[in-house]
Amino acid sequence: MLAASGAVVAAGTTVAAAGPAVAAHADSTAPTPTQALRRLLYGNELFASGHGRHPHQSLEDVRRLAAGQHPFANILGCADSRVPPEVIFDQGLGDLFDNRVAGNVVDDLLLGSIEFGVEELGTPLIVVLGHERCGAITATINAIRTGAPVPGHIAAVVDALRPVVEPVLSQPGDPVENGVQANVRAQVRALVDRSHIIAERVHAGTLQVVGARYDLDTARVTLVR
């Protein structure tokens, strides 16, 4: 199910808990890309099943991390308050390098931040995390269909998502869900296509770029093909 290290990973099923294999790497500061992905998905399995451990959230952890950070995953997620990466992946302080914006869309600032996580902090995994019933996708669809002006700087979000969302509106199924998944795929491609820092590490096998979707109803994360 997991591609070889360095690939742009894609799948369409929920990944079951990896159990002891993941736990063995839980405190490692330099996991492989595959180990990092398994650790994330195992954490989500714990959270979604009501068995979250809430690790690395003590004052001792605060003091331990004061001298530096070694996150094992780089997250490009939506700003939606219901999708906080540390919570849904059952992680804690210093575990994830978060980059969040409405619609989880890559612009130059977000790309620079993600590259910082890769280049300076050595994260072996990037996850583009979309989610069910995304408000930014919904707003983009409404703007396309009605032609109504979008207020303020929200228009910048809609303009960024429009080229991704518009082509899938004629597809069968729920348009918002189609847009969510199309956007995840598009941002995965954009990270590799626009960043030589990311592309070089992907080709070297030291970095994976993964698309994923969070289900608001079940709390489960699935990888997006």
In which residue ranges do the predicted regions lie?
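Short glycine-enriched loops at secondary-structure junctions
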Residues: 77-82, 102-105, 131-134
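Short helix-loop-beta junction
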Residues: 90-98
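Short, glycine/acidic-enriched capping/hinge loops at junctions between secondary-structure elements
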Residues: 84-89
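Divalent-metal-activated hydrolytic enzyme cores
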Residues: 1-70, 94, 103-112, 116-123, ...
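Conserved functional hotspot residues or short segments at active or partner-binding sites
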Residues: 128
